Amino acid sequence: MSLSSLAISANNISYRIGSKIILDDINLELRCGEVTTLLGPNGAGKSTLLKLLCDEITSFNDIRYFGKAKDQWDGNELAKRLGVLPQHSTLSFAFNVNEVVELGGLPLSLSNQALREITSNMMQKTVIKHLAERAYPSLSGGEKQRVHLARVLTQVSQHQQKIVMLDEPTSALDLSHQHNTLKLARELASEGAAVIVVLHDLNLAAQYSDRVIVLQDGKLQADGAPWEAITSKMIENVYGHKTLVQAHPTLNFPVVFAA
């Protein structure tokens, strides 16, 4: 693997709160051009791992972005390459949707016209252009989620080599927007980004991921392509539920059925 294709390297990642071990000696290398999905039951450590990887939680773990430690990066430059959609985004000001999306341009050196063009494009991709003048607090949960996705996409729009982290980006979305969001993740990866997604839906993970990482009680339980990681045995061991995993009738990914 060339260094340029390695977006994140994280060695011996551990985290605890008091005596509770949240993550236990996780080693990861995340590559450009791939969608990597984190799976696992509630409390497995998925969101904590994402927060450590993006430095939302300060730690002394060895995490590198594109081969450089965080303290070797200029903060503004890293912000242009590392976009994070948290599980919950709050905003109390009555900005309209267009203004919220434009907040993603803060680390960028762009003319007003260039920023308007980028935000318009990202709003089109996330299907929120019709909401442009709506006050953000008046939106539904799913609409707010798509607004923040457009903001994150605006933030990282100027670099082909970038990292996009999405923590449960489909949790408030209807079926159509779930698939649109994960198609955008695939599009980003095809353009060279490293995309890391936290999901609960195993079938969405199987359909849209290049790689699936399964956590349980802070430990790595599976790591591989969807066919390698999403198996009936893994699901029973990790989730305690019997399932049947079969091939999609026309597409090459596993489909999980309740047994």
Swiss-Prot record:
Gene Ontology molecular function terms on file: ATP binding; ATP hydrolysis activity
InterPro entries listed in its UniProt record: AAA+_ATPase (IPR003593), ABC_transporter-like_ATP-bd (IPR003439), P-loop_NTPase (IPR027417)
Domain ABC transporter: 8-242
Documented EC number(s): 7.6.2.-
Binding site for ATP: G40, P41, N42, G43, A44, G45, K46, S47
Top EC group: translocase
Record key words, sorted: ATP-binding, Cell inner membrane, Cell membrane, Membrane, Nucleotide-binding, Translocase, Transport
Membrane topology, record value: Peripheral membrane protein
GO cellular component: plasma membrane
Keyword Flavoprotein (UniProt): no
Compartment annotation: Cell inner membrane
Subunit description: The complex is composed of two ATP-binding proteins (HmuV), two transmembrane proteins (HmuU) and a solute-binding protein (HmuT).
Similarity section: Belongs to the ABC transporter superfamily. Heme (hemin) importer (TC 3.A.1.14.5) family.
Protein's recorded name: Hemin import ATP-binding protein HmuV
